[in-house]
UniProtKB/Swiss-Prot annotation:
PANTHER family: 2-OXOGLUTARATE OXIDOREDUCTASE SUBUNIT KORB (PTHR48084:SF4), 2-OXOGLUTARATE OXIDOREDUCTASE SUBUNIT KORB-RELATED (PTHR48084). This is 2-oxoglutarate oxidoreductase subunit KorB. It comes from the Bacteria. It comes from Mycobacterium tuberculosis (strain ATCC 25618 / H37Rv). InterPro entries: 2-oxoacid:Fd_oxidoreductase, THDP-binding, TPP_enzyme_TPP-bd. Residues 27-41 have a biased composition (Polar residues). It holds the Pfam family TPP_enzyme_C. Residues 26-50 are annotated as: Disordered. Pathway: Carbohydrate metabolism; tricarboxylic acid cycle. It catalyses: 2 oxidized [2Fe-2S]-[ferredoxin] + 2-oxoglutarate + CoA = succinyl-CoA + 2 reduced [2Fe-2S]-[ferredoxin] + CO2 + H(+). The gene is korB. CDD domains: TPP_OGFOR (cd03375). Is extremely stable under aerobic conditions. One of its GO terms (molecular function) is thiamine pyrophosphate binding.
Length: 373
């Protein structure tokens, strides 16, 4: 099969125009560029739906819900242009309780649905609410590909280290040795570190917060909501029925020696009196006593390092016992988003392509042809 000279020239022109297009690779827009705003004052109650909240008493989801409700007015966006998409699990009831649009979708597929919505509707602020089971088990592939593509969505991953809705089985973040209904002799699985996973997928924004730390949670959410691109926020939260006290070590006596709060541009020191710090150790990082190191050896947190290796090393400081758990923003860099590039590519193709049969034939023929004798 051969292609006529006119068709070959036509196809070359189309693809040449596409190759020379910037395809939206200008990562200077804000998260909600193109999303309609409102000049009407908003309060937390404006984002409260008429649905009865059906979580167990004491569930950490209540704190997160109230924090989100009180935070959303800061964005100044029309409620009709905010969408929360969830999968399956206790956390996935979230869209019912917000006076915005939402999807309560299927297990693990919220990032895929959010990807399509972000591509199709630039006028929407798209959020994903998921849990450790929903996101990291059946939804693992959807999550990492949304992150690596840098889709313009904000993903909230509620991590209670247990399957709550299905009544207490171990999850992908449960500790080794976790005794549950499905692991009566203790879990053998090595758990995922959600922050490490997101950084491995090269997410452009990765943060972690504790449900009971309202100020810290709001600070991370505020930054994630303004970040254009894929933003993942892991929220450590309690399940009082099936995994009660899972994160008590980060709340009770001695928490100052376990929690490391990081802020961009500030030295990483912690402890009741700043007696501990983070320093370099070989190819990674380690905790040292502040009195034992020179001041210039203490790491100054830089969330804007392009290489994710530094943020990854920071995420590896903690273990399943929660010693040296880092809270705050690990990584916050700028990179072109997939949805911006895709929309620009569509515009370029429409502008470059001729109409009629010739255009269809040029696409069917492709760029390379062979003659078969």
């Amino acid at each position: 099969m051969t292609r006529s000279g006119d068709e070959a020239q036509l196809m070359t022109g189309v693809t040449g125009d596409l190759a020379g297009t910037e395809l939206g690779l200008t990562p200077s827009l804000t998260k909600n560029a193109g999303v309609p705003t409102t000049d009407q004052p908003q309060k937390g109650k404006d984002f409260t739906s008429d649905q009865e909240v059906r979580w167990c008493p004491g569930c950490g989801d209540y704190v997160i819900l109230n924090t989100i409700r009180n935070f959303l007015p800061e964005l100044g966006l029309r409620r009709e242009n905010i969408v929360f998409i969830s999968g399956i699990g206790c956390s996935s009831r979230f869209p019912y309780y917000l006076e915005t649009y939402g999807f309560h979708s299927i297990h693990g597929r919220a990032p895929a649905i959010a990807t399509g919505l972000a591509l199709a509707r630039e006028d929407l602020s798209v959020w994903v609410v998921t849990g450790d089971g929903d996101a990291l088990s059946i939804g693992g592939n959807h999550l990492i590909h949304a992150l690596r593509r840098n889709i313009n969505v904000t993903i909230l991953l509620f991590n209670n280290r247990i399957y709550g809705l299905t009544k207490g089985q171990y999850s992908p973040t449960s500790e080794v040795g976790k005794v549950t209904k499905s692991t009566p002799m203790g879990s053998l699985d090595h758990p995922f570190n959600p922050v490490s996973l997101a950084l491995g997928a090269e997410a452009t924004f990765v943060g972690r917060a504790l449900d009971s730390d309202r100020n810290g949670l709001t600070e991370v959410l505020r930054a994630a909501a303004q970040h254009r691109g894929a933003a993942l926020v892991e929220i450590l939260q309690d399940c009082p029925i099936f995994n009660d006290g899972s994160f008590d070590a980060l709340r009770k006596e001695g928490a100052e020696e376990r929690v490391i709060k990081v802020r961009h541009g500030e030295p990483i020191v912690f402890g009741a009196n700043g007696e501990y710090c983070v320093v370099k150790s070989g190819f990674g990082l380690e905790v040292a006593k502040t009195a034992d190191v020179a001041i210039d050896e203490i790491i100054v947190h830089d969330a804007q390092v392009d290489d994710p290796a530094y943020a990854f090393a920071l995420s590896r400081l903690s273990d399943q016992n929660l010693d040296h758990t880092v809270l705050g923003i690990f990584r916050h860099i700028s990179r072109p988003t997939y949805d911006d590039a895709a929309r620009s590519q569509v515009v370029a193709a429409r502008n470059a392509a001729p109409s009629g049969t010739a255009a269809l034939q040029s696409l069917l023929h492709g760029r390379d042809t062979w003659t078969v004798d």
